[in-house]
């Protein structure tokens, strides 16, 4: 009800140009009147709105992503599953290194074995491998994004086989080498649907779908 009222009051900010939207971000911050490390007992709830275009400068063109094999974003038992500011702070150093090398974002591996694909810094990730849509399972260190959920529901309703499971970086590499990785994309409230055209792992570059947007990715975006 608060959100509906807010948007109706600020509807002049809703953009109409193609590829634009009104970004809505609710958040909370603690405001207890003391210092120290403790659970928050009082918080302020805020909603901000902003007209936006594409999250990445590439727009709907495929982005380049670097797989991080040293730093970790989150571990099971922590806050990786939550929309928590600290999760983003933990990803900043690796993100800056990726940007220096010309990559838009970091694709994180699990925090224990550095073996399993988890998520990109600002979005969940999906792959089409030999006709099957594969996305990392929610194991407690991955954000259960609403856009991820929506993509899964849409794809299943249209007859696609969608698997939420562990996906190792080795399996992904084999699919790339064998030509079975047909396309890849990220999805999130800010990025919406963003095609991935290149992955870099340990300084080896892999091009996906010739660096072009895939059919499923385009369909979801449209």
Question: What role is predicted for each listed range?
Answer:
Residues 15-29:
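Extended, Lys/Arg-enriched charged tracts that mediate electrostatic binding to polyanionic substrates
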Residues 2-19:
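FAD-binding glycine-rich core of flavoenzymes that anchor FAD
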Residues 1-5, 27, 34-222:
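Helix-start/capping segments and mature chain N-termini
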